[in-house]
């Protein structure tokens, strides 16, 4: 999949997969998590102490699912949670319940980020439209200050997926697992600098013309 897409296209293809084709959003989330997890294992990362920095949107849900896959494999993993769990998307709320079943620690201690050997960035996906501030900016600054390598899910948090612009502050990742298609903003100079090595993951979301051609 060499095509690069806009935010609007990413959202439209996602909605078509769930609302028209009927693929449950949880299935897509699990596929995104598994793709990210496999890239973590295949690349040269130190998995001694992994911290997944997740917010309560669906990008965060992807990360929380990654945390569970790591825990099942016997890897020391902690979730640094940003935002109120009561306001989580339905899928992310479910992922938090599953993480709780597996006794995955959830923290709000920034020192956990500082002491990690690998950080998974699952704060913001393609839908970010305003500058990052407050505790979200604090978390991104902590990620960038840490010695650990960082893997971003879909796009580095704080990067505009259309323009590649830094929205106040942005994660500088060593690797990014982006879903379905690359994003136009990650092809810009700044986008490339923040994304690191890009892995495009086929999770079952396609452009409508490809879907219709397959029917």
UniProtKB/Swiss-Prot annotation:
GO MF annotation terms: metal ion binding; NAD(P)HX epimerase activity; nucleotide binding
Residue stretches making up the YjeF N-terminal domain: 10-211
HAMAP family tied to this protein: NADHX_epimerase (MF_01966)
Entry's EC annotation: 5.1.99.6
Protein's UniProt keywords contain Nucleotide-binding: yes
Database matches in PANTHER family: NAD(P)H-HYDRATE EPIMERASE
Binding site for (6S)-NADPHX: 58-62, 125-131, 154
Names of the cofactor(s): K(+)
Swiss-Prot/TrEMBL keywords: Isomerase, Metal-binding, NAD, NADP, Nucleotide-binding, Potassium
Name the UniProt record assigns to this protein: NAD(P)H-hydrate epimerase
